[in-house]
Design a protein with these regions (language model features):
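A glycine-rich helix N-cap at a beta->alpha junction
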Residues: 68-88
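Acidic, glycine-rich active-site loops and adjacent beta-strand->loop/helix elements
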Residues: 11, 54-61, 82-84, 165-167
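Alpha-helix C-terminal capping segments
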Residues: 39-43, 70-72, 150-155
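Short, well-ordered secondary-structure micro-motifs
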Residues: 62-66, 87-92, 147-148, 171-172
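Alpha-helical metal-binding/catalytic segments enriched in His/Glu/Asp
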Residues: 16-59, 183-190
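Active-site loop ensemble at the mouth of alpha/beta enzyme cores that anchors a bound cofactor
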Residues: 74, 91-106
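Residues forming anionic-ligand binding surfaces in small-molecule and nucleic-acid pockets
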Residues: 1-24
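Active-site-adjacent substrate-binding region
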Residues: 99-101, 105-184, 190-195
């Protein structure tokens, strides 16, 4: 009954820039970033046990995150995601909340949770200390795995940090590699400076 088809998408660096175009960046970027975080942390002394989870069924009920929280029993949650970049043709400048190359994005609130105030403040202070640009957004039309994890047990302090990405959920997404590198630097610094308590 019909012919199966798939998009013919390949990885591209855009015209000598640091912008990258590829498929399925939501949330391959998060998985790739976590791998790089673990590599960076292996040579840095810190008191924390760090877990990374590539979950399933986020878009249909945060199901994998719920299971992961029950298995891991986390003390905090740093959800690493894409953030919808709004610097696209056709939008007025005042409507642009998140832009490529502007730094990682700290989500203040989405439809599934409000980021923990103390953890948010710690990330903002760490970004200032490390001279890392940081953008902010709200996303009232969707949520992330943090929306399930923050409700685990007595509650888990949670935030969402995203890499600005254009055209998520399409055949090609676009992100700026500087944002990726800055997210990596920020998250490594945050994890390193968190105490074990």
């Amino acid at each position: 009954p019909g012919d199966p088809i798939i998009p013919d998408t390949t990885f591209h660096v855009l015209n000598g820039t640091r912008m990258i175009m590829a498929k399925a960046l939501d949330d391959r970027l998060g998985c790739c970033l976590f791998i790089d975080i673990i590599k960076a942390l292996q040579d840095i002394p810190h008191p924390n046990t760090v877990y990374g989870v590539g979950t399933v069924q986020e878009e249909v009920g945060l199901r994998g995150a719920t299971t992961a929280a029950n298995v891991i029993e986390p003390d905090i949650c740093l959800t690493v995601e894409v953030a919808i970049a709004t610097d696209v043709p056709g939008l007025e400048k005042e409507d642009v909340e998140v832009k490529l190359g502007g730094g990682p994005v700290l989500t203040l609130a989405d439809a599934s949770m409000i980021g923990n105030r103390n953890l948010r403040s710690f990330i903002i202070e760490t970004a200032k200390k490390e001279n890392i640009p940081l953008q902010f957004n709200t996303m009232m039309g969707g949520g992330t795995d943090g929306g399930a994890i923050h409700k685990f047990g007595p509650g888990v302090p949670a935030v969402v940090l995203g890499i600005p990405t254009r055209y998520i959920h399409s055949h090609y997404g676009v992100f700026h590699y500087d944002d990726y590198e800055n997210a990596l630097k920020l998250l490594v610094s945050v994890i390193k400076d968190l105490d074990a308590g």
